[in-house]
């Protein structure tokens, strides 16, 4: 499949470059860079001082100088050694949205792309959304049903939510109501915002390649199911919230290291006597409690990563057995 990339130049974040690399090594062709040529607004130093959001100063300092996730490390697309034509585009601003002009859209359409990855520009609408066969694909690294807005991976820790989520969606003209191509949940790393964000970004790099494989295999039903989230839109935390957040993370880190030093994990294997499809697609029936394997010495043994199979009508289990 042929794809293009909406970007702000040759510099990408590490996880974005890894996404492109996986697509290319997976047999797909990067045929176009659509580069944001809009000039940055020029603001003089006096106006910056007057209009600076001092109520969010702690967040801005922390995010700029303390947040160093490996997944956001700047990386040059030239490192992939690809020859990619590019189009530099000036968009038309209407409210908070950006629209491409007809001349640029004509050039983009001429490349007959299968899809476009959005790694740049702002809120895009209009003809660009239909400039590729399967549209424009964009990431949202938060649970769209709970946390819309910014910052990524922050509010799950703030609200002690045990899981994060991320989605890859095909954009539509209605904000946050795209077509979900991929969605997954990840355990929240509540003792480190940096580690939590890093995990979210690096765990989703293969998604566009997976969607391409589905399309090539004729699995396309998900391409027309629209999403309609109704969650609140979150904003950057003010100084009070950020202070409380940092204290919470510090407490979580102390608790994490205490457990790591003085406590041990207990793993076991449970058997539920129902077909697996009932777990994948639960209905109105009641799922019974697992039948746990008996462990003779619970203090120094655990079982994990099981695989079950039947021999003469009896279930046998292959698993990891650890005695410590």
Residue ranges: model-predicted function:
Residues 1-324:
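One-carbon transfer enzymes
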């Amino acid at each position: 499949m042929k794809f293009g990339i909406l970007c702000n130049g040759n510099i990408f974040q590490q996880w974005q470059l890894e996404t492109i690399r996986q697509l290319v090594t997976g047999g797909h062709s990067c045929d176009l860079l659509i580069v944001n040529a809009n000039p940055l607004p020029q603001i003089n130093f006096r106006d910056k001082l007057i209009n600076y959001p001092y109520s969010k100063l702690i967040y801005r300092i922390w995010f700029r100088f303390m947040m160093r996730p490996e997944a956001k490390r700047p990386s040059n697309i030239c490192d992939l050694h690809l020859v990619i034509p590019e189009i530099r585009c000036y968009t038309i601003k209407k409210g908070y949205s950006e629209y491409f002009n007809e001349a640029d859209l004509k050039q983009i359409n001429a490349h007959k792309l299968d899809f476009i990855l959005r790694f740049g520009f702002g809120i895009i609408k209009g003809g660009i959304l239909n400039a590729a066969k399967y549209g424009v694909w964009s990431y949202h690294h938060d649970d769209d049903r709970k946390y819309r807005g910014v910052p990524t991976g922050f509010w799950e820790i703030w609200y002690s939510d045990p899981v994060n989520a991320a989605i890859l969606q095909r954009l539509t003209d209605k904000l946050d109501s795209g077509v979900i191509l991929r969605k997954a949940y990840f355990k929240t790393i509540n003792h480190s915002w940096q580690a939590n964000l890093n995990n979210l970004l690096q765990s989703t790099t293969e998604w566009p390649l997976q969607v391409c494989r589905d399309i090539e295999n004729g699995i396309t039903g998900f391409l027309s199911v629209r999403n309609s989230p109704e969650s609140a839109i979150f904003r950057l935390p003010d100084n009070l919230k950020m202070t409380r957040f940092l204290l919470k993370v510090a407490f979580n880190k102390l608790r994490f290291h205490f457990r790591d030093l003085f406590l041990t994990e207990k793993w076991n294997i449970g058997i539920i006597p129902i077909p697996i499809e009932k777990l994948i697609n639960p209905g109105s029936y009641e799922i019974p409690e697992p039948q746990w394997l008996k462990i003779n010495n619970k203090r120094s043994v655990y079982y994990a990563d099981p695989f079950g199979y039947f021999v003469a009508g009896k279930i046998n289990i292959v698993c990891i057995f650890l005695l410590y």
